[in-house]
């Protein structure tokens, strides 16, 4: 928009100069007219340079906008990946806590089973001892009955 304004302003200056040049040309010499035409040419050259710079800035702006969009997409992907990893980490922590509590319960059960096993081994040893004593007593009773 401002490019059009600058262009219109420059053309207005050219037209103003040409009207002034026309009015002065009748009274002025040919050298003055050449000087004015040189000014017009320099203004046109400057206008063209400004237009070229404006085109270059638009190209740079478009490239920067594209780069910004690319970075924005990458940022969104990174944020989504971070959110997913945080969620996975949270789930992993919950699973670890659950496994720890289950492991503690299993340890308690193993300890209880070990205690029962020890009691059963002791009871078994006592019963084996009683059986041996009973066997010896039965053999002794059999021998006593046979001798009698």
Swiss-Prot record:
Topology in the lipid bilayer: Single-pass membrane protein
Localization annotation: Membrane
Keyword Transmembrane: yes
Segments traversing the membrane: 125-147
Signal peptide: 1-23
Name by which UniProt lists this protein: Uncharacterized protein TP_0222
Coiled coil region boundaries: 49-129
Main localisation: membrane
One GO cellular component, as annotated: membrane
Organism this protein belongs to: Treponema pallidum (strain Nichols)
Top-level division of the source organism's lineage: Bacteria
Keywords, comma-separated and alphabetical: Coiled coil, Membrane, Signal, Transmembrane, Transmembrane helix
